[in-house]
Amino acid sequence: METNNKLKILKTGTTTVGIKVKDGVVLAADRRASAGMYVAHKYVRKVLYVAPNIGITTAGSVADLQFIYDLLKNIYHYNLITGMRPITIKALATYLANMLSFSKYLPYIVQILIGGVDEQPRLYNLDYVGDITEEDYTATGSGSVEAIGVIEDEYRPDMTLDEAADLARRAIFSSIKRDPYTGTGVIVSKITKNGHEEKEYYPQRKI
């Protein structure tokens, strides 16, 4: 009963997108934070970085997401200090999946994409019970139905990173038009082995 109540109380909306191509990974998300029908904040950052070449997108309970983000950063830096080499993206995603699975009876209410480039581009989708899948493209959150439709219609494995970034932007803007929990603007991040480049986009207001 406690878990069911937690799920109901913390049900929030958002849209996040991940696209993997040969040159890197694109992560994107809208900027609105909602609690039920209430817009809690208009300018929330949902694309975060564990390292310059590793990013995550966040959806779910803000407190749970903050804890997990800090944990992932600590794991990455601890591995640098003790192992003298960066942890792989696959290992980082697997660690988080195991932690979420162990906590499934008192779960962290999160939906997380982990993406980046080490030996090759990687994109993982994780839910709150620890299910993990490696994807070429994916979308999460309340606006994911609209976003994934746009991506599936236009995605190609041979897309450039710039083309993937534009596709992610348009996918989330399609969700902003239809999903009341998705809004304000879009952050789009292009991640390569050498780091990331980020841009923000906002809808043009009609006069």
Curated annotation (Swiss-Prot):
What does the entry report regarding how activity is regulated? Answer: The formation of the proteasomal ATPase PAN-20S proteasome complex, via the docking of the C-termini of PAN into the intersubunit pockets in the alpha-rings, triggers opening of the gate for substrate entry. Interconversion between the open-gate and close-gate conformations leads to a dynamic regulation of the 20S proteasome proteolysis activity.
UniProt-listed Enzyme Commission number(s): 3.4.25.1
Q: Name one Pfam family in it.
A: Proteasome
> Kind of enzyme, top EC level?
hydrolase
Q: Which SUPFAM superfamilies match?
A: N-terminal nucleophile aminohydrolases (Ntn hydrolases) (SSF56235)
An example molecular function term from Gene Ontology annotations: threonine-type endopeptidase activity
* Active site, per annotation: 14 (nucleophile)
Q: Which InterPro entries match?
A: Ntn_hydrolases_N, Pept_T1A_Psome_bsu_arc, Pept_T1A_subB, Proteasome_bsu_CS, Proteasome_sua/b, Proteasome_suB-type
Catalyses: Cleavage of peptide bonds with very broad specificity
Keyword list (alphabetical) reads:
Autocatalytic cleavage, Cytoplasm, Hydrolase, Protease, Proteasome, Threonine protease, Zymogen
The listed locations are: Cytoplasm
Report the sequence similarity comment from the record. Answer: Belongs to the peptidase T1B family.
HAMAP family for this protein = Proteasome_B_A
PANTHER family membership: ATP-DEPENDENT PROTEASE SUBUNIT HSLV, METALLOPROTEASE TLDD
Query: What is the official name of this protein in its record?
Result: Proteasome subunit beta 2
